[in-house]
Amino acid sequence: MRYTMYKEYDKKGVVYMTTKNELNKKISTIMKTDVYTVSEEATLKEVLEVLVKYKTSGLPIVNKDNKVVGFISDGDIMKFIAKQNPRIIDMTSFITVWYDTDSFEQKLHDLMGLNVMELATTKLVYVESDYDIDEAAKVLGEKKIKKCPVLENGKLVGVISRSEILRYALSSYLEKEAAKAE
């Protein structure tokens, strides 16, 4: 969707031009540019420390050249903790399947020493900085993800999240409604 201009009148009859859809603005206007990243060499303990310290749900993973090579989210970590690994025992043709009974604490302990790339999403989903907000919303919605890196000429310049898009959309809507009420 691209910009569609149309005339709108305010209460005093003054004509002004506006966009038909406020989500046509570029994501660069609302994305977060103070991006926290982790190295592809990081352990999950280091990742969790960054997630907690900066109260974020996901982080781009960069290599030594600062190129984005993956993304790790709290969802990836929760999947690891929640999974139950089957343990198959074959006793002379009697096959038994038991599921591990590792406690949450044990799984968390096992998690801490893993390299981030063992759990990370390496099929990188990203948007370009010149995407319209509605295009970014479509990517996040179709891929069912909460946030993704924003790249410009292959370099990380920000992150965009569903919550930022929704905050912007609601704010724009409320401002427009308030202007109509004046």
Role assignments for model-derived ranges:
Residues 1-182:
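Tandem CBS (Cystathionine beta-synthase) repeat/Bateman regulatory domains
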